[in-house]
A protein has these predicted regions:
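Ubiquitin-like/PB1-type beta-grasp interaction modules and other compact soluble beta-rich domains
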Residues: 1-66
Length: 67
């Protein structure tokens, strides 16, 4: 297991977990969020291939509607 920081919270994940798997495990809809790892945008097409390393800082951003 490895530790990452997901939106400011420490999370322990499988070292082989993809972005898709981590998002799903934490209640995010992969089709409705943007992801950056260590301030670098991850293309949605890469979610299944992108892996994490110890200490990665992961930011998940969802669009908000407002008026």
């Amino acid at each position: 297991m490895i530790e990452i920081i997901l939106n400011g919270e420490r999370k322990t994940i499988d070292p082989q977990a993809s972005v898709t798997a981590v998002l799903a495990a934490n209640g995010y809809d992969c089709g409705r969020v943007a992801v950056a790892i260590n301030s670098t945008f991850v293309a949605r097409a890469d979610y299944d291939r992108q892996k994490f390393v110890v200490g990665d800082r992961v930011d998940v951003v969802a669009p908000m509607a407002g008026g």
